[in-house]
Amino acid sequence: MKRAELDVVVLSEDLPNEGLVKGTLGTIVMVFNSPTTGYLVEFCDEKGKTIAMPVLFPAQLKRYFTIRNLKSLMVEGNYPVADPVDPDVMADLMHKVAPVEWEDKKRRVYEDIQRLLISRPDYADMFNIMDGGEYNGMTLYSLVQAENGEPAWSNIFVRNFDTRINEIYVDPNLIGKVVIGEESMSVIVYSFTDDRFEIRDKVSSDYVIESHTHFNGLLSALIEPVS
């Protein structure tokens, strides 16, 4: 896809000399077409101050996707699109105390999911647009979707209860993290320790395939290979 000035892009590799890591968001400020295609890309810190402005080639960049872009792709591909979560239900899920009869481990999972929704509005905003979704082998877990009156298999509470409260095996690499989705060969998690969204190998979950500061950066990494 041809890129233009002011397009937001995602860095697809580490640039140690620039102090930039894979997944960092930048803005194209100039396009070069000769002798080969290249882009002058501005990267800023959280305060909007420029921290680097390298010239990059197309292979070093990925397209930038948002939840609305994903929803459009799902509609175009005839994938089912769940309704957004009702604002009142969302407020309850974010602030209501877990049932007192729950065991401590279950309460901790519930509270971690609440903490994620509160502390990362970039992620929580997805549920104002659609309640999770499945697209070409990728699943983002839902909050309230149900099947025959029971939470769907992709319910984020169900998936995390299964991951962290399991009599057979509890993956030590996922303790203290919230699993927010999966692909065929990977799990998608949020790490409170690093305050980052991660794509981890499903079999060897100690291996972090990619790590992203922003949820939309994570989306861009997940969607571009399959879009």
Where are these regions (language model features)?
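Compact, glycine/acidic-enriched structural inserts
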Residues: 201, 205-226
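Short, surface-exposed secondary-structure junctions/capping segments
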Residues: 64-68, 222-227
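Glycine-centered tight beta-turn/hairpin loop motif at sheet-sheet or coil-to-beta transitions
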Residues: 48, 185, 204-206
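Short acidic-glycine loop/turn motifs at beta-strand connectors
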Residues: 191-194
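Catalytic Cys-His active-site segments of thiol-dependent hydrolases/isopeptidases
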Residues: 42, 198-203
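A surface-exposed partner-binding patch
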Residues: 66-187
